[in-house]
Regions:
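Alpha-helical DNA-contacting segments of helix-turn-helix folds
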Residues: 52-59, 66
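Hydrophobic alpha-helical connector segments
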Residues: 61-100
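Single conserved hydrophobic/aromatic residue that forms the stacking wall/gate
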Residues: 162-170
Length: 170
């Protein structure tokens, strides 16, 4: 399957984030990285904000699809334990520095955070719904937090501990 120009632009934008950081994403830098003209970018993304939001949506969707592939079925048909296991298996090996930078950016911008929240809410139990007297529910929340901690560790290269066995143990 041929990569669409839109996907190529998003990959180029991700490359810019990887090499120069989120603030370096401009029409000029992405045009240079993608080999397209600024006009070609404007056709797909009418503003820099639209480009950055599309990058967040693209990565969140990719993450969601990876978890669905690991799960092997529709998340709506899976148990919370199955969804959490898929989340843990996908989180650490998919960790990258650019994704961490984008997640940090999204943490302070409600529009950029929406794609990530959509995915997370599908896979992780709402902390407000956790019964603090239920040990199993608390174990699930700890497993979720451990998966996130492992993702963070892997994304900054601080401690590369991931194995598929570690995810299975969560």
């Amino acid at each position: 399957m041929r990569t669409s120009k839109r996907d190529s632009i998003l990959q180029a934008a991700l490359h810019v984030v990887e090499t120069d950081g989120v603030t370096a994403v401009t029409y000029e830098s992405v045009a240079a990285a993608s080999g397209l003209t600024k006009g070609g970018l404007l056709y797909h993304f009418p503003s820099k904000d639209a480009l950055v939001l599309a990058l967040h949506e693209h990565l969140a969707e990719r993450w969601d699809h990876e978890m669905i592939n690991v799960l092997g079925k529709d998340p709506d048909e899976a148990t919370q334990d199955e969804r959490l296991a898929a989340y843990a298996r996908v989180s650490a090996p998919s960790a990258t520095g650019p994704e961490l930078l984008l997640m940090l950016e999204a943490s302070t911008d409600s529009e950029l955070n929406k794609p990530w929240r959509r995915v997370i809410s599908r896979w992780i139990p709402d902390p407000a719904e956790i019964d603090p007297t239920d040990p199993r529910a608390l174990q699930k929340m700890v497993a979720y937090l451990a998966a996130d901690g492992l993702w963070l560790s892997e994304s900054v290269g601080a401690c590369l501990l991931y194995t598929s066995d570690a995810a299975d143990d969560m």
